[in-house]
Amino acid sequence: MVKKNKIIVTGGAGFVGTNLIKLFLKKTKLKIISIDNYSSGKKSNHIKNNRVKYIKGKTVNINKLIKNPKDIKSVFHFGEFARIFQSFSKMNECIDSNSVGSNAVFNFCLKNKIKLIYSATSASLGNNGNDKNLSPYAFSKSKNLELLENLKKWFHFKYEVIYFYNVYGPHQICKGPMSTVIGIFEDHYKRGKPLPVVKPGTQSRRFTHINDTVNICYYAWKKNLCRHYSIANKKSYSVIEVAKLFNSKIKFLPKRLGERYASALINKNLSNKMYKYFGEINLKDYINNFIFKNN
């Protein structure tokens, strides 16, 4: 019997993928394969370890990129297009990644009997589920959840789903169109520039540290219970509140397409109970520590 001693992390050179790989190197003896197209991932995120292999490629080509799928224990599919506002101007790229690419990953796992761990988004949950229609990004992600639900019914496909909430922390993107809110604020603070806040500024988010996020990813993988998890923070901040924590000047930007007023925290999605977990790392403490280090 072939020993399954490897996991795949799509988006392994990106923000979440890099932190997940670090955690798995620490907690397991598994070998790790990263698949990343480097649209937002960086070679500077590569971890020098003989247990990690980095492959440049698109998820749609996963069957060609992975020569021996019998070795693969699990796939963490985190390599999707992951920005709401940018999905309007880059809709083809969003659909290519989130629909076509993800379908290839799902089929790869199904065909080879590999467990999938999939990153979902809180952006599609609010307003009684209607927020899924706010942007191409939210729509594509919600359709993937519907597909997974049907794959479970049709083929008994096994997977875990983890809902992310405005993740921040080490390796986050700070510059360019794929930047995170906290990353943008940190970058502008370092450069002495006013922090950009999209109007009205009162839109609230449950900012969740990357360590809390990947710990739940690992927990879900380890427990192997085929559940839907959410990892958020108990405290919700408005964007303007967060900007003010930096004690810096603020400039307002025009309202944007697809903007949600609040992060949704629900008990159920589709037919699945949501197992809710809350992060331990406090955003205010994190920002205070950042300011201390940069003064």
Question: What is the meaning of each model-derived region?
Answer:
Residues 1-165, 290-294:
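N-terminal Rossmann-like NAD(P)+-binding domain of SDR-like oxidoreductases, especially those catalyzing
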Residues 216-258:
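Mid/C-terminal beta-alpha module of Rossmann-like enzyme folds, strongest
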Residues 132-140, 164, 174, 178-182, ...:
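The catalytic Tyr-centered alpha-helix of NAD(P)H-dependent dehydrogenases
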Residues 128, 170-173, 240:
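Short beta-loop-alpha junction of Rossmann-like oxidoreductase domains
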Residues 10, 167-171, 197-207, 229-237, ...:
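Glycine-rich Rossmann NAD(P)(H)-binding loop
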Residues 143-151, 181, 185, 242, ...:
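Hydrophobic alpha-helix immediately C-terminal to the catalytic Tyr-X-X-X-Lys motif of short-chain
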Residues 167, 183-196, 204-229:
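Alpha-helical substrate-binding/gating segment
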Residues 210, 238-241, 256-293:
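Conserved C-terminal active-site "lid" loop/helix of NAD(P)H-dependent oxidoreductases
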